[in-house]
Design a protein with these regions (language model features):
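Arg/Lys-rich, low-complexity, intrinsically disordered basic segments
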Residues: 210-304
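Intrinsically disordered, low-complexity regulatory segments
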Residues: 1-239
Length: 304
């Protein structure tokens, strides 16, 4: 299988196939790293490596039957912005599927993480995030992020296409509070983006969802194995325009239109409106029709 794939919607099944193939190689690669370790307790290192390899195989099995998503660049930007104040996150109820492979058209800002260098020693690096994958195994969930390996300086040349960036392993049916002071910052950043993306995907007034069935070799292989080769494409609705007069009540004259930023809201629903669900109130353009739109420069950054 080629370890070089185009970065486009139709290539998503191939990208997933590449990741699954690389996960299948984890046992041998993990053992090589264990053998090169300078840790004096070689037996413990090898036992840990074997356990990791077995877990990776179970993740690959579930990921292979999961849903595939392509998130457009504008939707990535909105989700990253919305992640800054997204409320708590329950993977069991908020994620669109139990297992998923999400490819981002535009990468997320770099996370401070580490890789093994050419001497098989850990080295701190900053890696962008191109892919997020999640797998539910029993009562637990594994959320992983990956960078295209071509962006990793001085990494081990193992022929892999993807480089792991960061991951989280925890309970699938539980509320994750992002404002918890004990939470790991990298985990908060990764999961808050995924939470925002998942909640926005479920908001029909915000996101457009279309289904593409790529006619590619990888998609045909998925079909032969009984897997769905369809890719859900998530893109952003154009913001609505809320017209106003040319002046406000005080007599101030408007010379431009402007963007009003979206925000999260707990909306009541259900019997006697006793239940609450998190909804994104989308951004909209306000001001007199026909006036120029005042553009503001935005810098996408991780939640702090």
């Amino acid at each position: 299988m080629s370890r070089f794939a185009d970065w486009r919607v139709s290539a998503v099944p191939e990208l997933r196939a590449i990741l699954l193939a690389e996960k299948a190689e984890v046992p041998a690669r993990t053992m090589r790293i264990a053998d090169m370790s300078t840790n004096p307790d070689k037996q413990a290192v090898r036992a840990e490596a074997l356990a990791k390899a077995a877990y990776e195989r179970s993740l690959a099995t579930t990921l292979g039957v999961g849903e595939m998503y392509w998130v457009s660049a504008d939707m990535v930007g909105l989700a990253l912005d919305a992640a800054g104040d997204v409320p708590g996150f329950n993977p069991a109820t908020d994620l669109p599927a139990s297992h998923g492979f999400m490819v981002l058209e535009q990468p997320l800002p770099a996370l401070r993480t580490w890789v093994f260098d050419t001497d098989y020693q850990k080295r701190d690096v900053e890696l962008e995030v191109d892919v997020i994958a999640w797998s539910t195994v029993g009562t637990g969930i594994r959320i992983e992020s990956f960078c295209r390996n071509g962006r990793v300086p001085n990494a081990i040349d193992n022929g892999s296409f993807f480089e792991p960036v960061w991951y989280h392993t925890g309970v699938v049916d539980g509320l994750y509070e992002f404002d918890d002071e004990a939470a790991v910052e990298l985990t908060v950043q990764l999961m808050s983006f995924l939470a925002a993306a998942a909640l926005l995907m479920a908001s029909p007034g915000v996101a457009d969802r279309t289904t593409l069935a790529p006619k590619t070799k990888a998609a045909r292989k998925d079909a032969k194995r009984g897997r769905s080769g369809n890719v859900t494409v998530i893109s952003l609705h154009a913001p609505k325009h809320v017209p106003t007069g040319d002046a406000d009540e005080s007599g101030r004259v408007y010379t431009h239109r402007w963007m009003v930023r979206g925000h999260w809201r707990n909306q009541p629903h259900g019997p006697n409106r006793s239940q609450r669900s998190v909804r994104w109130i989308p951004s909209y353009i306000k001001g007199p029709a026909g006036k120029p739109l005042r553009e503001t420069e935005r810098v996408w950054a991780w939640r702090r």
